[in-house]
Swiss-Prot record:
Record keyword Thylakoid present: no
InterPro entries, per the entry: RelE/ParE_toxin, RelE/ParE_toxin_dom_sf, TA_system_RelE-like_toxin
Family: Belongs to the RelE toxin family.
Keyword Glycoprotein assigned: no
Keywords for the protein's UniProt record, in alphabetical order: Plasmid, Toxin-antitoxin system
Protein name, per record: Putative toxin Y4kP
Its biological purpose: Toxic component of a type II toxin-antitoxin (TA) system.
Annotated signal peptide: none
């Protein structure tokens, strides 16, 4: 199986920045760890794109991070498209 290219949507990049900025207010080191953890998890999707569970929204998958409360919805096509980054307790949108 060949590695897929990871492609972040603008929405996903904005959410990652927002998450980092929010956590950084209280703990800059924790913010760096969370953002790095999300990045590492996403990078692994290049090699194992089907590792996430089937998504709640049609044609998506969800990478659940067990050690931090974030879920990464994504789509697999020629590339792995990162749709957004969601807190586990956040209300899900109808579409991504």
């Amino acid at each position: 199986m060949s590695r897929k290219r990871i492609r972040w949507t603008l929405r996903a990049l904005r959410r990652l920045d927002e998450i980092g900025a929010y956590i950084e207010k209280d703990d800059p080191d924790a913010a760096a760890r969370v953002v790095a953890r999300i990045g590492t998890a996403v990078d692994a999707l290049a090699e194992y794109p089907a590792s996430g569970r089937p998504g709640r929204i049609k044609s998506t998958r969800e990478l659940v991070l067990a050690d931090i409360p974030y879920i990464i919805p994504y789509r697999i096509s020629r590339d792995v498209e990162i749709l957004t980054v969601m807190h586990a307790h956040q209300q899900w949108p109808q579409v991504l």
